Amino acid sequence: MSKAGGNDSKSTLYCSFCGKSQHEVRKLIAGPTVFICDECVELCMDIIREESKSSLVKSRDGVPTPKEIRRVLDDYVIGQDFAKKVLSVAVHNHYKRLAHAAKHNDVELAKSNILLIGPTGSGKTLLAQTLARILDVPFTMADATTLTEAGYVGEDVENIILKLLQASDYNVERAQRGIVYIDEIDKISRKSDNPSITRDVSGEGVQQALLKIMEGTVASVPPQGGRKHPQQEFLQVDTTNILFICGGAFAGLERIISARGKGTSIGFGATVQAPDDRRTGEIFRAVEPEDLLKFGLIPEFVGRLPVLATLEDLDETALKRILQEPKNALVKQYQRLFEMENVDLTFQEEALTLVARKAIERKTGARGLRSILESILLETMYDLPGLDSVEQVVIGPEVVEGKARPLYIHGDRAKDAPASVSA
């Protein structure tokens, strides 16, 4: 047992791992024959967390199977089965391609870059963020809206590879095996059907710049960003084996898809076309490369994204599940915040249904759920730190509709705050 010698041996205890005394640390936890301090506990937790980042179960070849990848995605993303399958297979094949390249050189396995198309708030970015947690290859996310052609104000396309290098601690070998997710890819569509009107430095120009790194080239990347440090040496990164996943909401694409195949006619004999009342995600399922060309992507760019995955609109049931089921569900997050005030937060089933309906009405998808909950809980979160006797807060449907205040339960009696009456 770790104790001090001499007169202090009975009074001063020491951590058995780092040797610090009980006076040097906040807590010292006693076991049957040893002691451990809070700092060593934190260190152990950090080690475990680092290990769990790449905790995918490996198959006999060291490659996670699509089902194993899908299982982890299911923990954080509700629905979107087709998109999950596409991503799981793509990442699995990416691992296999890297393993194959190291052992064989008789057949070259080409990569299949992916384009994710889905309405806003359907989970495109969340899928990519979840992949980043679980992969043991370097992963980075980039925003297409910040990119411009080289020589113009904004970020160069090479900055994407620089971010991947940073994610791999500037290990070029590891960076060349990484995965890049480019968000808001629809925002770099050509601004006009006429390709020659003006210089389009943030649209078609960026698509042209992305072509080579997506297909495979040796990119010269400045380690500290090229525009601020022009004299530095460049790192050479081969992008041939880097998998690119692009995602975008493609607002307006549904009209292009719906119009395809519908003949136009005028006059008294014209056929009256019924408006397409299908949901956006349902229309996206019928997308063809020609629709993307009409939207403003150039043919060469579409050709480098051979795998198309569409995401569905989130319905009421899916939004309710998103509120409650994932590991980082919004309801769980707010309940944890309230727990810090020693208060239980409870949502009635009807209240969650109304929150989901509001998000659908706003057409913001899952992204709008947080703002709705924030507005509902704002006054409560403002008042709560000053109310010592509150043990539970109940959110009912009237609260979501703005007709009543949340119900505060004080000790063993229920009481409104200030009164559960119509506003």
Curated annotation (Swiss-Prot):
GO terms for cellular component: HslUV protease complex. It comes from the Bacteria. One of its GO terms (biological process) is proteolysis involved in protein catabolic process. SMART domains: AAA, ClpB_D2-small, zf-C4_ClpX. GO terms for molecular function: ATP binding; ATP hydrolysis activity; ATP-dependent protein folding chaperone; protein dimerization activity; unfolded protein binding; zinc ion binding. InterPro entries: AAA+_ATPase, ATP-dep_Clp_protease_ClpX, ATPase_AAA_core, Clp_ATPase_C, Clp_protease_ATP-bd_su_ClpX, ClpX_bact, P-loop_NTPase, Znf_CppX_C4. Keywords: ATP-binding, Chaperone, Metal-binding, Nucleotide-binding, Zinc. Component of the ClpX-ClpP complex. Forms a hexameric ring that, in the presence of ATP, binds to fourteen ClpP subunits assembled into a disk-like structure with a central cavity, resembling the structure of eukaryotic proteasomes. NCBIfam families: clpX, PRK05342.1. Belongs to the ClpX chaperone family. This is ATP-dependent Clp protease ATP-binding subunit ClpX.
